[in-house]
Each structure stands twice: as C-alpha cells, then as structure tokens.
A protein has these predicted regions:
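N-terminal and secondary-structure boundary signal
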Residues: 1-171
Length: 171
C-alpha cells in the first residue's frame, strides 16, 4: 500500500479476523501477505509490517507474515501494447491452496474506486507497479485481472473505513 495520507490499507483487525476465520474452517496454515511498492527489502519491509499493525495481527491470529517480493515471480506476457513486455506475479500465489484478497474500500484519483481488482497490484513486481502509474491505469488493472483469472478464490472488501473524495492521499 501507499501509506501517505493516513490509513489507506486494509485494517489489521479485519485481516486478523479473516485469519482466525480461516483457521476455524480448517486451514492448517494462514499467511497474511503484502507487497508494498515503497518498502522493497529487508528491514524496511519488516518495519512496514510492524508499523502498519500487520505483524501484531499475525501474532494474535497465528498467521504468518508474507513479503510477496521475497520470492520469485512468474512471468506473463500481457495482451496490451502499453504495458511492460512481461509482468511478474509473486510465485507465492501459485503455491497457495486458497487466495483471499482483502482490499480496503476507498476512492482513487485514477480509478474512482479501488476494490479487489486494484488490490492485486500488491502481488506484482515493484517495477511493474510503478510502470502502471505512468500508463493508462485502468487498462493495466484490467490486464492484471485477466492474467490472474481464476487465481483468487474470494474477495472480501474491508468496509471498516471508507474513503470519500480524491483518495488515497487526500481522502
């Protein structure tokens, strides 16, 4: 997530509740993952998980924190002339039995709202993420969702906080 302007990311309380729910339904292991573009390596990512409350949510629920950028990427060739030649998706997604996307309900100055479809940008390579904001973002998001079709099992929107206005920074 882009953490300027306040709470612009999924509530740790919602993620904690979701992890506990998954365990109650028989999950043997639950991972809470993120791939923030501003925090790409080592200690800064650990600091992000701590400062955002994700680490505490993991500890309280028994889930494990997962850095989508710590592993390899599965590469795909997009079907859109304005997109990068390849787009990399975190390999961790393909190792999971179930993938649940939990986006915050918020507005966005480029896309009007961001829900499940834009939330998946956390799973792609940082360089690809940055490129998406220099091209037609809606087309990029649509292509990401086409390439990831069938990968996400469910999307649960976090409505505990909702943005109004020019988000995410000015909402």
């Amino acid at each position: 997530p882009n953490r300027h302007g306040g709470h612009g990311y999924t509530s740790p309380d919602v993620l904690e509740a979701g992890a506990k729910w998954a365990f109650s339904k028989g999950a043997g292991e639950v991972w809470i993952g993120d791939g923030p573009v501003w925090s790409m390596v080592g200690d800064s990512l650990n600091e992000y998980f701590r400062s955002s409350g994700l680490l505490d949510a993991c500890e309280r629920s028994g889930a494990k924190p997962l850095d989508f950028h710590a592993g390899e990427y599965r590469l795909f060739r997009p079907n859109h002339p304005d997109l990068p030649e390849t787009i990399g998706f975190s390999e961790y997604l393909y190792q999971a039995d179930v993938v649940i996307s939990v986006p915050l309900m918020k507005t966005h100055f480029n896309t009007l709202v961001t829900l499940g479809i834009k939330n998946l940008k956390g799973c792609i390579r940082p360089a690809d993420k940055l490129t998406f904001h220099t091209i037609e973002l809606n087309a990029a998001i649509a292509e990401v969702n086409r390439l990831m079709a069938g990968l996400v099992t469910a999307t649960v929107v976090d409505g505990s906080v909702a943005y109004e206005g020019m988000g995410p920074g000015g909402a």
